[in-house]
Design a protein with these regions (language model features):
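Key DNA-contact positions within bacterial/archaeal DNA-binding proteins
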Residues: 58, 86
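Short capping segments at the starts of secondary-structure elements
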Residues: 69-73
Length: 168
């Protein structure tokens, strides 16, 4: 569903409203469905898996980036997660207050803040991520397994192309 209308209804209505415009309807369909799919999966995982651990999507992304790259500079977490440093600061304060991460100033450059998981944070991610992955598997359950590698490659290509446009 796309709001109260089905995807088919929405796409037909868009075609009817915008049919006279000289636009690339296939590009619009790909990007709008990519956006819808990403939001649907994110909302599902937030309501189910992440809610059980009292985590927002942003808090999960912070924990994920730290889990994979620790120790990691706070600016790298913001870049990897795609959110502002101000947003990151509030989320990290909450995660630190819950005993899931620690922040320390770099001994080489006092302006840099290094972030690591605590033992409690690592334990949470080790428990949470298999549950999260079950949700990921449910989200793609209706796709042909033999197409998943190609699909992932296509999504990577979209990401790389969009990211390369930032520099232009």
């Amino acid at each position: 569903m796309a709001g109260q209308h089905t995807l088919d209804e929405t796409e037909r209505q868009v075609q009817a409203r915008l049919g006279d415009l000289k636009i690339d309807f296939e590009a619009m369909a790909v990007t709008s469905n990519l956006f819808r799919a990403a939001n649907a999966v994110r909302n599902y995982l937030e309501r189910t898996v992440l809610a059980q651990h009292d985590l927002s999507w942003t808090a999960f992304v912070v924990l994920w980036v730290v889990w994979i790259w620790e120790p990691v500079e706070s600016r790298v977490i913001a870049e990897e997660g795609g959110f502002s440093k101000a947003t990151l600061t509030g989320v990290m304060q909450t995660l630190e207050g819950r005993g899931l991460i620690t922040r320390t100033r770099s001994s080489k450059d006092g302006r840099l803040v290094l972030v690591k998981l605590t033992a409690k944070g690592r334990k949470m991610m080790n428990q949470l991520f298999p549950e999260f992955n079950k949700g990921e598997r449910l989200a793609i359950a209706d796709l042909n397994r033999s197409d998943l590698g190609s699909f992932a490659d296509l999504l990577r290509a979209v990401t790389i192309t969009a990211d390369s446009q930032k520099a232009n």
